[in-house]
Amino acid sequence: MSIIAITVFVAGYALIASDRVSKTRVALTCAAIMVGAGIVGSDDVFYSHEAGIDWDVIFLLLGMMIIVSVLRHTGVFEYVAIWAVKRANAAPLRIMILLVLVTALGSALLDNVTTVLLIAPVTLLVCDRLGVNSTPFLVAEVFASNVGGAATLVGDPPNIIIASRAGLTFNDFLIHMAPAVLVVMIALIGLLPWLLGSVTAEPDRVADVLSLNEREAIHDRGLLIKCGVVLVLVFAAFIAHPVLHIQPSLVALLGAGVLVRFSGLERSDYLSSVEWDTLLFFAGLFVMVGALVKTGVVEQLARAATELTGGNELLTVGLILGISAPVSGIIDNIPYVATMTPIVTELVAAMPGHVHPDTFWWALALSADFGGNLTAVAASANVVMLGIARRSGTPISFWKFTRKGAVVTAVSLVLSAVYLWLRYFVFG
């Protein structure tokens, strides 16, 4: 069974990477083969957290997509777009820095998928107003979302899994992860000129945008107030997740339901903007990866790698960093972390105890979160952003993303390794 699972997964991944076939079709077809071959049971598809569809992710995306769709009808995205351009004096690099910082902060406080859903429409409007290619901006924002989301417990789904299995708190993540994220963010800002390239705004459009009054962009203040109230409540519930223990997916769906009820919009007004292709792609991808988990392929690889360390703590941390980032970049960091957590638990118990046991959890979190920047399908935020780009008429190819992502991931891992070594082995 494991040979069939590996063959189907590799073939499907190659087709997704080729950009020649709809990735949604590929994912659903591969998922159907996995189920048809008996690798993943029909019950597992719908009810298994490790081998089936992660409904928390699906419903979180659906709820936030509906909220963002309703929010579009207020004109607030046009307002923010004009404000950002004027604030940066229409300079593309300054605009990119501003949007990247907003994305990173939003991802840390909320979660990276929600932030991407909110920032992408603003970015597309800014680029459209200035007549510049939106691809560098969207790619940079995805990188920032994965980096910024690593800072807190609620910022990235893998962090939530790690916190649950290791008994870590919101404050633990803030104290131990945020410093590393700050260092990597500084490096990412330094890479922005390279990511931007030779993009320049059209002079005529710059003059037109600078002359606009952003307040005139708001054309439904009543709906904006309703959206604002719902978003504040939704975001507050996200932040209070460790206390309330209410799943973010449920919060997002409740928020979407309230907005739909009181917005006065027609059903087609908010459902037409939902990224149905993206949701179906995720469903298929979860089953594809679940087949590798179900057959024990991922666990066997992880165990074989960790046995090589022989109890050396520094080598173990380095191995976790070196293995987790590329593997997370290939099979999606959420199911990978779900599989690795019991293995790290065993590792912690087997170590001699010269460094704090949580060091291994921070290594897993940093490598899995930053590994999410490696490929176009490595993290939920990546898939969502590329789906939005495709629908806007500016598709981003798998390899265009990966060429940039490989560099950003490599820099992030080197800085993470130095951070872990200095903090926990030299000064710890």
From Swiss-Prot:
Key words of the record: Cell membrane, Membrane, Transmembrane, Transmembrane helix, Transport
Organism of this sequence: Mycobacterium tuberculosis (strain CDC 1551 / Oshkosh)
Q: Supply the InterPro entries for this chain.
A: Arsenical_pump_ArsB, Cit_transptr-like_dom, Diverse_Ion_Transporter
List all membrane-crossing ranges: 26-46, 51-71, 90-110, 135-155, 177-197, 223-243, 278-298, 314-334, 359-379, 407-427
Where does this polypeptide localize?
Cell membrane
* Similarity field: Belongs to the CitM (TC 2.A.11) transporter family.
Q: Name one GO cellular component term.
A: plasma membrane
What this protein is called in its record is: Uncharacterized transporter MT2759
Bilayer topology: Multi-pass membrane protein
Name the domain of life: Bacteria
* Pfam families, A to Z: CitMHS
Q: Which GO terms describe its molecular function?
A: arsenite transmembrane transporter activity
